[in-house]
Amino acid sequence: MAEGDITTFNAITESFSLPIGNYKKPKLLYCNNGGYFLRILPEGVVDGTRDRNDLYITLKLSALSQGEVHIKTTETGCYLAMDSSGQLYGTLTPNEECLFLETLEENHYNTYKSKKYADMNWFVGIKKNGASKKGSRTHYGQKAILFLPLPASPD
């Protein structure tokens, strides 16, 4: 191409057929901090595990409105929740502490901020050792709050 030449491209008129994620299917939430999957145990403990075959990492994300989700295990039906001290826990009864604001960040990871404590910017997080991180110790820029939703089954 010589200097001063102009390259033109044809207008794209056909629609793109990009694969759209099926949000009805169960997901695994993979944490960027240490490579853990978010796990909600039957007794209410929330932590991370690297075992992809663990029964308690398969999660169902349900949107209540745009950007607001409930997160629960498919195995036990325990909902993810955050209490007034920022501690993550699992509960069988959904309440206002079970609502999270889901945001797709610029790096293509998702963050989940407690709706009830949104003014305090408390996020779901997993520490490098796999333990849950208190919401009061989380903030933007931490790897601990970055989650990648992955399909639970490779279909």
From Swiss-Prot:
Pfam families recorded: FGF
For this UniProt record, the keywords arranged alphabetically read as follows: Angiogenesis, Cytoplasm, Developmental protein, Differentiation, Growth factor, Heparin-binding, Mitogen, Nucleus, Secreted
* Entry's Gene Ontology molecular function annotations: fibroblast growth factor receptor binding; growth factor activity; heparin binding; integrin binding; S100 protein binding
Where it sits in the cell: the answer is: Secreted; Cytoplasm; Cytoplasm, Cell cortex; Cytoplasm, Cytosol
Q: Choose one Gene Ontology CC annotation of this protein and give it.
A: cell cortex
Q: Where is this region: Heparin-binding?
A: 127-143
Q: Which SUPFAM superfamilies match?
A: Cytokine
Residues reported in the UniProt entry to bind heparin: 33
Q: Name one GO biological process term.
A: positive regulation of transcription by RNA polymerase II
Positions annotated as pro-peptide in this chain are 1-15
- Gene3D superfamilies reported for this sequence: 2.80.10.50
Source organism, top-level taxon: Eukaryota
Q: List where this protein forms a coiled coil.
A: none
Physiological role: Plays an important role in the regulation of cell survival, cell division, angiogenesis, cell differentiation and cell migration. Functions as a potent mitogen in vitro. Acts as a ligand for FGFR1 and integrins. Binds to FGFR1 in the presence of heparin leading to FGFR1 dimerization and activation via sequential autophosphorylation on tyrosine residues which act as docking sites for interacting proteins, leading to the activation of several signaling cascades. Binds to integrins.
Sequence similarity: Belongs to the heparin-binding growth factors family.
Q: What is the protein name for this chain?
A: Fibroblast growth factor 1
- Species for this entry: Xenopus laevis
Originating gene = fgf1
